[in-house]
């Protein structure tokens, strides 16, 4: 016999979803079905929560308590960098392995680093900023018109001052 249902118990599920799209409820069913939730309704909640990250893969945190699911986006560094580029939405089915060729100001990188600081193991904002610059390089964009790695070298050399917080 299964254990008694505790209404105060909180469970967390982490899923990868494409922003603004209702995922296949057949993919959600094995994860959500045993918790007594409707996969279709949860899929719509996820689509609502991720609509500002339209077309970008993001991690979604589902907080499940008393058979109620609340979806919240846990943005990754790459999704924040891609949204900072403000590029038009591309058709995911037609274009694969897209290289982003935009340009981000350095101040925007520092803002993303502040958002990601709680998740990073970096000791200060400079080290977290270097992590974000590395992500920007792998995404394929430029920072202030330069290669992100050149800016990392400039931070290491002390040529660029990084704010404390």
From Swiss-Prot:
Cellular location(s): Cytoplasm
GO molecular function, one term: large ribosomal subunit rRNA binding
Matching Pfam families: Ribosomal_L11, Ribosomal_L11_N
One GO CC term, this protein: cytosolic large ribosomal subunit
Entry superkingdom: Eukaryota
Entry annotated with the keyword Cytoplasm: yes
Biological process annotations from GO: translation
Cited SMART domains: RL11 (SM00649)
Keywords: Cytoplasm, Ribonucleoprotein, Ribosomal protein
PANTHER family found in the cross-reference section: 60S RIBOSOMAL PROTEIN L12, LARGE RIBOSOMAL SUBUNIT PROTEIN UL11
Functional description taken from the UniProt entry: Component of the ribosome, a large ribonucleoprotein complex responsible for the synthesis of proteins in the cell. The small ribosomal subunit (SSU) binds messenger RNAs (mRNAs) and translates the encoded message by selecting cognate aminoacyl-transfer RNA (tRNA) molecules. The large subunit (LSU) contains the ribosomal catalytic site termed the peptidyl transferase center (PTC), which catalyzes the formation of peptide bonds, thereby polymerizing the amino acids delivered by tRNAs into a polypeptide chain.
Protein family membership: Belongs to the universal ribosomal protein uL11 family.
Subunit description: Component of the large ribosomal subunit. Mature ribosomes consist of a small (40S) and a large (60S) subunit. The 40S subunit contains about 32 different proteins and 1 molecule of RNA (18S). The 60S subunit contains 45 different proteins and 3 molecules of RNA (25S, 5.8S and 5S).
Name of the protein: Large ribosomal subunit protein uL11
Organism: Candida albicans (strain SC5314 / ATCC MYA-2876) (Yeast)
Name of the encoding gene: RPL12
